[in-house]
Regions:
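Feature recognizes metal-dependent phosphohydrolase scaffolds
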Residues: 1-286
Length: 286
């Protein structure tokens, strides 16, 4: 693990990770694509959980597994165990950025509603607290006089993130999916371009993608047929047991002791039943 407390190093990792994200050879517009060789590991919301991140690194073992890729999203806005504890999810964010720099061909990040809200200054409250303010205070606690410089690097990083990933075997991965009521107005061309300010604002298709909820099995099936998808993997909605299934949709959570992740062999087709059976719990990782 790197020393996350050095502002210059943190900014360096964040700036480099942002550039790698923008220039990713797997990326066209706002979509990452993966072929039919190797493995992709999909995670759920992580919200500052360093323990599960360390287990993810051990499982992926990228230093000896060049054919394995890993996708992360929603890293920030940790839920403190007590009201007087700081949100230090900046630590996870910097660790993941450093991992991206170390393994640029293996580590991938997607846009999420919390990262987007922090970038846009759009308030989110949990239990009466402002998670944006708590995150900024955590950055100030960690980096003191250099906090604003680090925050600028954080926002550059958030602005660089793609929206989704798709595999040759029919798996679509994103932070969430549009609300069913927005299906008819959702602009699917958003995946083909760099997201604009309008895309990322309320009413935009990128915003709709990362904030969507209320997905029924029928709605998921409709979207699967429309987009030619075998299975959707997302996060966004909290899952106390680690995951939930809604038809072709699997919702993963990686931010607590019952958190999960999902390894996918890219060389074969999967049913959703098979994908569900492949879900791994972080507690199973030594």
């Amino acid at each position: 693990m790197i020393d996350v407390t050095v502002a210059e190093a943190a900014c360096g990792h964040l700036h480099e990770a942002a550039q790698l994200s923008r220039d990713d050879p797997n990326r066209t517009g706002a979509l990452l694509t993966f072929g039919s060789a190797g493995q992709v590991v999909m995670t759920g919301d992580m919200h500052g959980h360093l323990g599960n991140f360390k287990k993810l690194q051990r499982f992926c073992a990228l230093e000896r597994s060049p054919g394995r890729s890993v996708i992360l999203h929603e890293l920030i806005h940790q839920e403190p165990e007590a009201s007087d504890q700081p949100d230090l999810s900046i630590d996870l964010l910097v660790q993941v950025a450093a991992w991206k720099c170390q393994f640029p061909d293996n580590v991938f990040l997607l846009q999420s509603n919390h990262e987007l809200a922090q970038l846009r200054g759009q308030e989110i409250t949990k239990g009466g607290r402002s998670v944006l303010r708590d995150f900024e205070q955590g950055v100030a606690l960690r980096y003191e006089a250099q906090a604003e410089t680090v925050l600028a690097a954080v926002y550059e990083y958030f602005a660089s993130l793609p929206l989704a990933a798709r595999t040759a075997n029919g798996v679509f991965m994103s932070h969430s999916l549009p609300d069913p009521l927005a299906f008819d107005v959702f602009d699917e061309a958003v995946f083909e371009r760099e997201p604009t300010a309008d895309d990322l604002a309320p009413g935009g298709s990128a915003y709709s993608l990362v904030w969507g909820r209320f997905h029924s099995a029928d709605a998921v099936e409709y979207l699967a047929q429309r987009w030619g998808v075998e299975a959707f993997l997302i996060g966004h909605t909290p899952q106390e047991d680690g995951y939930a299934r809604v038809g072709r949709l699997l919702i993963l959570a990686s931010d607590h002791a019952h958190g999960v992740f999902l390894p996918i062999d890219l060389s074969r087709k999967y049913t959703v039943d098979e994908l569900e059976r492949n879900i791994r719990k972080f507690v199973s990782v030594e």
